Amino acid sequence: MAVDRRDGGAGQDVLRRVGEASVLILISLADGPKHGYALIQDIKELAGVELGPGTLYGALDRLERLGLIEPLPAEDRRHPYRITAPGAAALRVHLDSIERVSAAGRLRLQLGGI
């Protein structure tokens, strides 16, 4: 039985709706907690994308409201975040979806002779 991924079914790719910045933040947090500046630096190194503070903190707020990340106790003036178990599960589903679409796209390019 196929799962309708548009209606909240198990395995739904909830990250399709939150944007690239949110996905990059989850990927960055997958190897451990980070505060805002560390996230900006890691994402720039990882993906060549420099998130501005408004984009970063807007995405952090959305991810926290969705329960995909959580804040940790502040260290001095820094406020670290970590990925939650539901956040890690959502990231896995999203990355699996990207891999399937990427493989299909590559196959179609090959079959099309492009």
Predicted regions located by residue number:
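Short, charged/polar surface micro-motifs in flexible loops or helix N-caps
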Residues: 31-35, 62, 87
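Histidine kinase transmitter module recognition
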Residues: 28-31, 72, 90, 94-97
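Short, Lys/Arg-enriched N-terminal segment that forms or immediately precedes the first helix
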Residues: 1-15
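N-terminal helix-turn-helix DNA-binding core of bacterial DNA-binding proteins
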Residues: 12-55, 75
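Basic amphipathic alpha-helical segments that dock to polyanions
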Residues: 56-58, 62-63
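Beta-hairpin "wing" of winged helix-turn-helix
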Residues: 64-75, 82
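Basic, amphipathic "hinge/linker" alpha-helix immediately C-terminal to the N-terminal HTH DNA-binding motif
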Residues: 76-95
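Amphipathic alpha-helical dimerization/coiled-coil segments
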Residues: 6, 92-114
